[in-house]
Each structure stands twice: as structure tokens, then as C-alpha cells.
């Protein structure tokens, strides 16, 4: 919460409320003297939050890419406190096999964060062309075996469950059973086995929910609605997300975007933000021991200037 610089009397937005951990901390720090808004795409999560928070926060069942339009319905056109987005998939969603996010639990191929949406993982896995499948697995999962995986998926259609898909993907990865190929160091907190289906499941989930496109829209909307002095804090969990946030902050903090060889500045761009975190903040060793899912988390923060 240090990066968000929470102070009583200001307005704050938790753009990805989830289980409400961040929202609870903001509510505590503002001592009930601030206006709080909580966004989530999952209607079930929002209902639980309503039970926990009551009238302490306003709940919005919406994708954070529609930040401005959603807040305007409540007469809010500017944010003077800050906006927080934690892009990690909710533990509640991962742990519920019936939501279809986990490659370790039996469930339908769903993966929709908002279950009112029509596109599901089943549609992508069983209906998309092989070339399109390979492209998203490579683009969103950064999986170098994407072509082989897409070919096997198409050959084994129809695929009905998460475990069936995970098994097909695992068979495409050379020496997938050799855990040494899937070790990642977490410092003194110990290593962890990375399942060979991790990248493919990430890619399908991101395609279903349009995660990167939503993030780009959210960043633009946040910058336009923040008042000078307010802060934007984003926690990412993989390189694609972090790259987008890093580049967005870099461009917003630039005072000139003219070509390097331009003799004079003609763009007239002004520096819009001050980057608070020159390097991303990562989880401490204690945090890693308490929650291994935080191993890839990176926090970046910026303060609006104009």
C-alpha cells in the first residue's frame, strides 16, 4: 500500500477486487473516510465482497477496461486518490475445478472470468483453426512448441475437460517428465515444478478474456481519469503484462517523443506522470514462503502530474 500512498478523504479504485485483500487494506487505511470502488468481472466474487464490505465500498460488475464509463454512472469523473490493479488470476477461480482455469483439477474447458460472456476455452480449443490456435499459444504463452501443441489439439478433438487438455499438451513437450527442465529458482524460498501445460493454459485464458487488450484500455482510461497527485499501481504476473505497463509508464513519463535525430521538438508532449518505481518491486523472501504464487509478481507505480 506504500506505492498507492493511501490517505483518508480521497477516492480509490480497486480495479481487480477478487477476494478483497487489497480492498480491505485500503478501507482500513482510509478509516472509513474515503469513497471506495471495487471492480471485478466475476459476479460470484462481487457477491462475496458485498457480504463482507456492505456499504463500505461500491461494487461494480465490470471489466476494468470500461473504467470511465462504469464510474461515470456514479457521478465520478476523476479520481484524486489512486487506482490499483492486481492482474493475478483469483485463487478462488484457480482452486475451483468447475471454472476450468486449472490444469491440475478436473473441470470443463471454461476459463471465463465473466461467465456472462459467450467465448469460452471450449470454443477456442474445439472450434478455432489450427493456425489461430498455434498463434495465440505462441503469442500469449510464449510457448516454443506451439505448432506441435495446436496440431495435437486439433487431432484429438473434441476435447471436453481441463485434464484431457493438460495431458495432450504435456505429451507435446520434450522430456516433460524431467522436472529439471521445468525448475525455476525462487531464492531461498525453494524451487518449484512448472507444469508443461502452464504456458498453454495461460495463453488460452488470456485469449478468452482478452487480457492484454483489456489492460491496454485500462491504462489509458486510468491516466485520463486520475487527478494530479493521484497514483496508479499495477501488479503484473508475467512478462507480457509487465512489458505493456513498463512501456506505458515510460511513454507517459516522456516529455518528448520526437524522432531522436529531430533538430527541435515539435511534438509538444508534456510529461504526464512521475514513475515512482524505477525498477519493479518484487516479492520478498517472506512473501514467497507464505505464497509461492507471488514468485513472478512485479509492482509498478506512477503518479499523475498534469
Each language-model region and where it sits:
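S-adenosyl-L-methionine-dependent methyltransferase catalytic core, i.e., the SAM/SAH-binding region
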Residues: 1-306
Amino acid at each position: 500500500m506504500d506505492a498507492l500512498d493511501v490517505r483518508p478523504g480521497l477516492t480509490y479504485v480497486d480495479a481487480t477486487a477478487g477476494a478483497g485483500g487489497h480492498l480491505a487494506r485500503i478501507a482500513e487505511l482510509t478509516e472509513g473516510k474515503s469513497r471506495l470502488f471495487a471492480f471485478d468481472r466475476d459476479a460470484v466474487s462481487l457477491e462475496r465482497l458485498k457480504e463482507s464490505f456492505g456499504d463500505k465500498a461500491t461494487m461494480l460488475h465490470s471489466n476494468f477496461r470500461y473504467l470511465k464509463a462504469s464510474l461515470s454512472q456514479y457521478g465520478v469523473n476523476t479520481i484524486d486518490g489512486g487506482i490499483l490493479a492486481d492482474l493475478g488470476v483469483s485463487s478462488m477461480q484457480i482452486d475451483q475445478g468447475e471454472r476450468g482455469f486449472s490444469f491440475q483439477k478436473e473441470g470443463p474447458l471454461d476459463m471465463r472470468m465473466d461467465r456472462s460472456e459467450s467465448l469460452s476455452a471450449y470454443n477456442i480449443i474445439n472450434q478455432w483453426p489450427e493456425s489461430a490456435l498455434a498463434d495465440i499459444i505462441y503469442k500469449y504463452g510464449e510457448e516454443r512448441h506451439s505448432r506441435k501443441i495446436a496440431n495435437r489439439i486439433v487431432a484429438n478433438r473434441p476435447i471436453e475437460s481441463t485434464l484431457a487438455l493438460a495431458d495432450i499438451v504435456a505429451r507435446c513437450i520434450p522430456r516433460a517428465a524431467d522436472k529439471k527442465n521445468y525448475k525455476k529458482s525462487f531464492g531461498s524460498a525453494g524451487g518449484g515444478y512448472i507444469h508443461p501445460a502452464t504456458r498453454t493454459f495461460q495463453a488460452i485464458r488470456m485469449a478468452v478474456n482478452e487480457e492484454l487488450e483489456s489492460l491496454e484500455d485500462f491504462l489509458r482510461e486510468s491516466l485520463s481519469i486520475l487527478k494530479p497527485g493521484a497514483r496508479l499501481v499495477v501488479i503484473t504476473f508475467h512478462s507480457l503484462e509487465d512489458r505493456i505497463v513498463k512501456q506505458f509508464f515510460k511513454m507517459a513519463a516522456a516529455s518528448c517523443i520526437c524522432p531522436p535525430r529531430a533538430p527541435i521538438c515539435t511534438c509538444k508532449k508534456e510529461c504526464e506522470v512521475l514513475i515512482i518505481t524505477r525498477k519493479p518491486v518484487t516479492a520478498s523472501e517472506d512473501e514467497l514462503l507464505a505464497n509461492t504464487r507471488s514468485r513472478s509478481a512485479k509492482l509498478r507505480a506512477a503518479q499523475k502530474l498534469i
